[in-house]
Amino acid sequence: MISVVKRPERRYFYETNGSAISKESFRIVREGADLTAFTPEEAQVVVRMIHTAGDLDLPRRVVFHPDLVSAVRGALRGGAPIFTDANMVKSGITRRRLPADNEVRCLLRDERAVALADEWGTTRSAAAVSL
């Protein structure tokens, strides 16, 4: 038998549209963060970093190599894979926004990373870099 669950009564208003929530969240980041030290292209990256970390003070600790943004864009357009050491990050990457259907990999749970980490006395993240 399937039990019927009553929908809870809404006692206050909150945004339920995911797109609107995201748009407002990025607006808050852009308005609240000091991005003056960055080029417009770098600022786009920093805004995403802040949004992910939830830290408006993050820009004080970010430095870019002058060629970083163009190098990364070129690599992605060329089909370079994206490696991360967090499955949550992998899940959060919007694949349709990638320019070349880039592969997104996280080797944190790869048995080879687990074995190397144990053998080398390091973390799985550090070991995965060698795979």
Predicted regions and their residues:
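Internal active-site segments that recognize and position negatively charged phosphoryl groups
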Residues: 78-100
